[in-house]
A protein has these predicted regions:
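Amphipathic alpha-helical coiled-coil/heptad-repeat segments
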Residues: 117-160
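DNA target-recognition domains and sequence-specific DNA-contacting regions of bacterial/archaeal
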Residues: 1-117
Length: 160
């Protein structure tokens, strides 16, 4: 399956991102293979959040323009995934972007961003707590949307 990295949804099927046209080359022999828990990013689009960890399928391929990597032993993928969504990472990334029109972030530059790596156990704990909080935010956001819908419905019923 040919994948793309979306800044909103992470890894997605390329046909979903580019519904109206076929982007993938007929010859995918030079495409990069990504496995579950691997990361990939578009070096020219990372400044808008186009970096993701593959979690939904076991394996796929991405365009050769993507930079793909997996974490070394002792680093928990979920912990690093949350790190990439922090304002600290964004700030450090902005300092390392290269180019004037199309700013890019090389793999060497991303590796030079300082990151605190606690023990694996603590990384798991931090990652799980952040995930629980993000899930709670999603639930509360959905609940809020339903309350707004209900309010609009009730207001319409009052003035029929």
């Amino acid at each position: 399956m040919v994948l793309s990295v979306s800044n909103k949804q992470g890894f997605i099927n390329q046909s979903e991102q580019f519904e109206d046209r076929i982007i993938a080359s007929e010859d995918t022999s030079n495409y990069k293979i990504v496995h579950k828990n691997d990361f990939a990013y578009n070096p020219a689009r990372i400044n808008v959040g186009s970096i993701a960890r593959l979690t939904t399928i076991e394996m796929g391929i991405v365009s050769p323009m993507y930079i793909c990597f997996r974490v070394r032993k002792g680093v928990v993928s979920e912990y690093l995934e949350h790190f990439f969504s922090t304002s600290y990472f964004f700030y450090e990334m902005q300092k390392r972007l290269e180019g004037s029109v199309r700013q890019c972030l090389s793999f060497e530059s991303i590796c030079n961003i300082p990151i605190y790596i606690p023990s694996s156990e603590e990384q798991h704990t931090i990652g799980k707590k952040i995930s629980v909080l993000l899930d709670k935010i999603d639930i509360e956001t959905h609940y809020h949307c339903k309350l707004v819908e209900q309010k609009h419905y009730l207001l319409r019923q009052m003035f029929i």
